[in-house]
Amino acid sequence: MEQYEDQPSDLELAQMSRENPAAFGLLYRRYIDTVYRYVLVRVPSPEDAEDLTAHIFENALSSLHRFRGDSRFSTWIIQIARHRIADFYRARRHDTLDPAALDEREAPGIAPDDLGLDTVKELLTRLPRAKAEVVELRVFADLSHSEIGEMLGKSEMAIRAVFSRAMK
């Protein structure tokens, strides 16, 4: 994220947070919306997204010693989010179906805000996973093409091409 006037950079905040975890609060406020939006589109419910987002920030705080500033903080925390989302689905694979939980999800009354998200999720499921991931990282995590390329081990031009094809 860009430098804020009269505020420390992300790298400075990360370094300060290693000694004083309270300094992590500003990083949290800068990135909570970005991380939450990214997670929300990839998990079944807003409650799951809230829980996962909290775990992601807990993990980031405990792993700050690994952040060296080689990439932007936003790239680093979204990488953590990708891993936690994968863990979330691995854990769910072993869960059994609970009929009571299914009944709760089918309760009448659809929130208007959920319609847009459901539509986006449906459209993303129609894309091949690699294209959907690029769209999610670009649109919901607000990462640049070069940051996505760095994260996925591809060139910026390749990511631009994938994103362009996915948006057609």
Language-model segments: residues:
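Internal acidic/polar
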Residues: 2-7, 87, 94-122
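N-terminal module of bacterial RNA polymerase sigma factors
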Residues: 1-34, 41, 145
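Sigma70-family region 2
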Residues: 18, 41-46, 54-72, 91-93
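A short pre-motif secondary-structure segment
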Residues: 134-138
